[in-house]
Amino acid sequence: IIFHDAEALWQLGVSESGQFMRSMAGAPGNRSIIRIGPAGANLVPTACINVDTYRHFGRLGAGAVFGSKNLKGLVICGEKDFDIKNPPEYNKLYSEIYDKATKTNLMAKYHELGTPKNVLPLNKINALPSYNLKQSNYEYADKISGEAFAEEVLARKVSCSGCPIGCVHVGGLRKLFDAGYEYEYAGVSYDHELVFSLGSQVGMKNTSDVLNLINETEEVGLDAISCGVILGFMTEALVRGDIKITDTLVELNFGETAGYLAAIRHLASPPNDFYREIGRGLYNYTRKKADGSHDYALHLGGLEMAGYFTGPAHLAGGVTGIRHSHLDNAGYSIDQKLLKDAAQLSAKTVAEKIIEEEVIRSVYTSLVICLFAREVYDLETVCRALAALDIHKTPDELKAASSKILKVKLELREKMGFKLENFPLSERYFETPSPYGLIKREFTDEILKHYGELIKNI
């Protein structure tokens, strides 16, 4: 382990920091570089950690943890290989999984348009949060859809190391950097969550404006989902008079990038108490306010919502997710699968589905399996893959281990003071139509009640 003085890099953006670290580290191709931007350096609780430029430890403030330790970044290098006990069997299974991923339609969505393919289908069923969820469909959805990004700005596709899919979609952002028509291109990765948070949530009407906001958010090292949701809240709060221009220091209007670009920089480097407070997240900012701003603050379980407004399972799943992630139990997917039976839907059924999915996904997250590839790696395939490494488990044993892991996480969360009743859902969730019509608070509360009872028995 080698330590380097990072004082000269401390307030640099993510890209420039990465360039310096790459030049210092050597060994191209055999390393991973993670680093923070100014947001983490300034201990902003919504700061993230950038991982190899296009990926992130994105949520829950990991960037601020790095900053609190005076740690600008890490470069991990290594060349060690692992011995495979049965190479022929390993190679056979590898080829089978590779073909399953590349020669079937299981991963086609992620390679072709990527997750922004969700934009138009969600918009069609009134499930795309827009204008701080004043609307659940967006009149400019076709202008910021996956199709629009692919046709207008997609420059290349990138994969995580060892993966053949290329799900990371990188757009080309044309940037003016000096007078005399001096331009440069920046590669900016985009996905559905960012197209929501820095697109429909704040009223952007074209792909370039969305990329511009994403690029600024990436450079300063903020959680892009939280950042966009906070910006949408601030815009509405200004209109309502719950905050003033003396707080925001800039005018914020849906669809106008200039104010948002400045506000993003202020969130990362807070110039006043307002930005210091709201940078802690909407739950912390609104819970002590008497101005009614909690009623339109879009958080679930204390964390800003993801880009779906599919129904009650997404709301309940967002509150209960063990990692505070919409991907813990995919409530948004449960909503869509159960929509055809909406009239007969029971709260207990939804709670059971949430827990069932949480257990299965805990298998994948514990084994560091990409959740995009969950249909490639069914539990039988996971067991065969482990066996190729001389680790022998059955699907039932994996689920039993996952349940134990989930139980330990729940116990830890309880010891740290987390209680479902401390995170009431904002009124906005029950005012805006979803695919289920207006969601009833009583029904969502009933789901959470059943969840609390059922989770004790996992």
Across the structure, where does each feature detected by a protein language model lie?
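Extended C-terminal regions of large enzymes
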Residues: 22-60, 66-458
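Well-ordered mid-protein domain cores that form the structural environment of catalytic cofactors
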Residues: 1-30, 35
